[in-house]
Amino acid sequence: MSKQLVTQFDVKKPIMAICSIFTASLILKLIFYDPSIPVVMDALSTFSFSTHIHAIGQLPENYLHPKPLWPMFLSLFFSVFDFSQTQSYMQLQKILSILISCITIFPLYYLCKKFFNSKYSLVGILIFAVEPRLMENSLMGGTDQFFIFFIVMTLLTFFNKTKIFYLSFVFAGLATITRPEGVFLFFSIAIMLFFRLRGKKLFLSKYLISLLIFFIIILPLSIHAEQVPNTESVFSRIISSIDQFIPSDTKPTPSEISHNDIEFNKNTISILTGLEHFPKFLGWVMIPLFILVTPIGFFLFIKKLNPDKLTLIVTSVFLSIPAFYAYSYPLLETRYLYFLFPIFCIFAILPIKLFCEKMRRPNLVLLGIMLMIIFISVLFISYQFDFQHEKESVKVAEIVIENTSSINEYYPESKYIKSLDISQNWLELNH
């Protein structure tokens, strides 16, 4: 029986295996999902913008969310469901984030297939499906999972050598509307497409059409952003971000950054600070699943380079730039590096593949590795993330709101105050 099971692991029906991984990922996330915890910070800002769109039936004319596509997407679902409590819509936002993180497994499998066969591609999506930090992040309801989905779709369609590659610029445009960091995804595929098409028939027309598709996607919201007071388009934000690194003799003026309600000064940005924190956080986010395999896989990719492998490396470098910028403040959060995780999964497959192929029973070894991945992930989540503390923090925040009129900051637990202090009556909130 055991021998038959291992032989069947040679994956003749990969769709069943993918669906099994999808189901396992969904079940694990729902186990840790707590409906009593509201959305907070950036996810709360997204929720507020979504409710505003839902209430007026269009984008507000007086302000624009810096990451508008996710709240626009949420507002469609807010229109479909009819809940009486605001908290129910917050939970809908979190559940949609969980579903998108699980759905990303499907295109990621076919992206892995560009480099490996079916059974090793399953290892890549399993790592992604149970990666502890991605699991925790998907429970928050923020933009990150939506953005990661578009990264995977961009790369998957870009590697297609038919006209489907044009879709990669559609997805890169959607990624940019989801988060401004998406423009770096666009830069990476635009550079690689130039080298892919160079010297071929209709090179210039194909290249310009690709760029045009991207700009058509982002232009409407970019124009709207420039017309809305105190709002920047993605290109204005890039220019202002670059300006942060240029020394100025004038007296510095504080500029507010939407992050945990903290004000940063322009002159606090330092390349040296970024160089200090970036490698430290890069190493930290690789624990526990990537730390032993992804660095090895990265160097093995470089050793036997081809255009597709080079595209992955170039994309990972470009997507690291926004993280380096964040750590230059420093904004000390690991989530700025989560956008690299789909590529990390692909890098991780190669050393696992080479290790298994050296064993006498590679399928059995591979099955053992996959079970170990799940075990390590669950163990890490159980010990690293204190979900009970978060639940208790919500209860404390409820007591504070009920019994006080003014509140002293006690971050990070106080992050729930703002979420719980809004009207819990959905009709009141929308009027």
Q: Model-found features: residue ranges?
A:
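Hydrophobic, aromatic-rich transmembrane alpha-helices
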Residues: S2, F106-L108, G274-D308, T315-L319
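Hydrophobic/aromatic-rich transmembrane helices and adjacent perimembrane loops
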Residues: D144, A175-P180, F184, I287, ...
